[in-house]
């Protein structure tokens, strides 16, 4: 009987919970306390379970008994165990209510449904996807050992070289691959520039109306936004100088202003570059949608005219698809080290395989062929929307059909009451941004920013019909210009 009792006691002195101790850390009692606390709170050690004696657990873990004594005393203070005189230490039968963190406020993260007229959608090209998949498989299958380790914070040299060739041929931007950084998109690139070049509270000119995502990126990074109005020639540089001539930077979309679609005139471009030199300021040039120009030669980018103050931002999100998460920065040579340091501090370096696969497609002419196939399809989509809105809206909306890009702007008459655009959108049952969403200062008529890429022609025509009829019904003849 005595032998049986001893066996029983030894079995009780074995903890059925693996505890791994870091012997390099001196406070072993804290490690034991933390492991036991987690086991009890997570339910791995049930209420009422007898814990091993301090001597038995010390032998099991190979530590001094006083470390276990200290751990048990801490658990007693936590209310997680109870000591029974002459019987040992047990997990408390009634555990304290767990301290549950209050739920975070609901995040305003909304992924718009893929239906007309959502922005940022592109047509799926099966030919391109097959070629990209094949290039990715080849890159992974034949990866050299040095391609599997840490990489350059600027990204793949192969892709940077191809981007440099593309920009020289199509955007008039001549740069060395060493001045290009591969990023995960325009907002990532913009944030890198902010971290590297600006301080919290620095004033930044921002087009008004302008691109909402970039406005959010700048404001959350601590920039002081200075709204600068836009007219038919683009950013009104003189208005910016009047509002805050000593601003540290300007964010612009000169080749295809978002959302108005106007191109910045050459006189304004020269004025903006002159201001940046005088003010020792930077220009963040977002050259989105530049690949899809439907009439006339491509416009030279601002960075191609006077690039020493210009940081150029480009993306493959519209050329290919947003889920690719690849974009690029072109940085003046004097600023490269600062921006690279900011990149290395954020996420060290970008993943290489998809970059090299995309570079292979660029080198083989696959990407250029893809854009040639897409341009007429997107031009047709633009025309379908414009014609349907004109037919069914019967003049209730003013249209600005762009010669470039993947969205058009339809504005209400100046006399339309506030809130009318939202009522029209809701009645039409469409997905789109309102022009008022893009404004910092609410001035001028409201309207609709209509993305037309990524949708079948019949779906675009149907959505435009519903929008046009809703506008006609709600505005009425009296609200239309005579």
Language model features by range: what are they?
Residues 225, 283, 431-432:
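Hydrophobic beta-strand scaffold residues
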Residues 1-139, 148, 159-161, 340, ...:
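N-terminal basic, amphipathic alpha-helical segments
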Residues 209-212, 436-440:
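Short, polar loop motifs at secondary-structure junctions
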Residues 305-338, 350-353:
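Active-site PLP attachment segment
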């Amino acid at each position: 009987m005595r032998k049986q009792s001893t066996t029983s006691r030894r079995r009780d002195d074995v903890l059925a919970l693996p505890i791994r101790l870091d012997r390099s850390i001196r406070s072993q009692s804290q490690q034991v306390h933390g492991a036991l606390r987690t086991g009890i709170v997570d339910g791995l050690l049930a209420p009422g379970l007898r814990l091993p004696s301090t001597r038995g657990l010390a032998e099991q873990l190979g530590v001094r008994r006083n470390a276990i004594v200290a751990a048990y005393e801490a658990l007693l203070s936590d209310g997680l165990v109870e000591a029974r005189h002459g019987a040992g230490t047990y997990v408390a039968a009634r555990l304290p209510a767990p301290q549950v963190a209050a739920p975070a406020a609901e995040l305003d993260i909304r992924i718009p449904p893929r239906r007309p007229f959502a922005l940022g959608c592109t047509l799926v090209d099966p030919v391109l996807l097959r070629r990209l998949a094949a290039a990715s498989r080849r890159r992974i299958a034949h990866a050299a050992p040095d391609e599997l380790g840490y990489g350059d914070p600027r990204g793949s040299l192969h892709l940077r070289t191809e981007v440099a060739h593309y920009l020289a041929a199509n955007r008039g931007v001549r740069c060395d691959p060493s001045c290009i950084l591969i990023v995960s998109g325009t907002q990532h690139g913009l944030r890198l520039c902010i971290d590297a070049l600006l301080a919290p509270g620095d004033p930044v000119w921002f087009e008004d109306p302008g691109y909402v995502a970039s406005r959010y990126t700048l404001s959350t990074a601590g920039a002081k936004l200075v709204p600068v109005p836009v007219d038919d020639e683009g950013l009104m540089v003189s208005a910016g100088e009047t509002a805050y001539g000593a601003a540290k930077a300007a964010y612009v979309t000169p080749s295809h202003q978002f959302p108005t679609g106007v191109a910045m005139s050459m006189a304004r471009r020269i004025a903006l570059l002159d201001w940046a030199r005088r003010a020792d300021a930077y220009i963040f040039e977002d050259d989105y949608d530049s690949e899809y120009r439907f009439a006339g030669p491509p416009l030279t980018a601002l960075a191609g005219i006077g690039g020493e103050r210009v940081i150029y931002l480009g993306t493959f999100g519209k050329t290919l698809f947003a889920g690719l998460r690849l974009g690029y920065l072109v940085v003046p040579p004097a600023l490269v080290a600062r921006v690279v340091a900011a990149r290395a501090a954020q996420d060290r370096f970008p993943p290489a395989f998809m970059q090299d696969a995309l570079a292979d497609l660029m080198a083989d002419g696959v990407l250029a062929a893809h854009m040639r196939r897409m341009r007429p399809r997107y031009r047709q989509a633009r025309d379908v929307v414009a014609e349907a809105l004109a037919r069914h809206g019967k003049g209730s909306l003013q249209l600005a059909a762009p010669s470039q890009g993947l969205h058009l702007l339809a504005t209400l008459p100046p006399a339309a009451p506030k809130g009318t655009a939202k009522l029209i959108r809701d009645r039409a049952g469409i997905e789109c941004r309102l022009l008022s969403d893009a404004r910092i200062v609410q001035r001028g008529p409201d309207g609709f920013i209509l993305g037309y890429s990524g949708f079948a022609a019949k779906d675009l025509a149907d959505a435009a019909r519903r929008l046009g009829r809703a506008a006609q019904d709600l505005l009425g003849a009296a609200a239309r210009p005579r």
